[in-house]
UniProtKB/Swiss-Prot annotation:
The name this protein goes by in its record: Co-chaperonin GroES
Cytoplasm among keywords: yes
Species: Proteus mirabilis (strain HI4320)
Xref: PANTHER family: 10 KDA HEAT SHOCK PROTEIN, CO-CHAPERONIN GROES
Keywords of this entry: Chaperone, Cytoplasm
């Protein structure tokens, strides 16, 4: 996939969530709900500050993140793959191993 986000935007591939019901049945897909975790596929150059300087992003390609799946998150299909385009500010945390 060749895509380069601009400024403070990132491209995220949502990670599938596996959930279990109270009875122990594994729920997948829409029954499990949408995951708010994903892997960073691409990052922009950084946030342009008021003084014109560019502040590099805190996330990098390959990071697993927890994000806010809100109004500013755009869903796109690129090369038959569902991805999310969001600002770095929509990312709440980086999951560290």
């Amino acid at each position: 996939m060749k895509i380069r986000p601009l400024h403070d935007r990132v491209i995220v591939k949502r990670k599938e969530v596996e959930a279990k019901s109270a009875g122990g049945i594994v729920l997948t897909g829409s029954a499990a709900g949408k995951s708010t975790r994903g892997e960073i596929l691409a990052v922009g150059n950084g946030r342009i500050m008021e003084n014109g300087e560019v502040k590099p992003l805190d996330v990098k390609v390959g990071d697993i993140v927890i994000f806010n799946d809100g109004y500013g998150v755009k869903s796109e299909k690129i090369d038959n793959e569902d991805v999310l385009i969001m600002s770095e500010s929509d990312i709440l945390a980086i999951v560290e191993a």
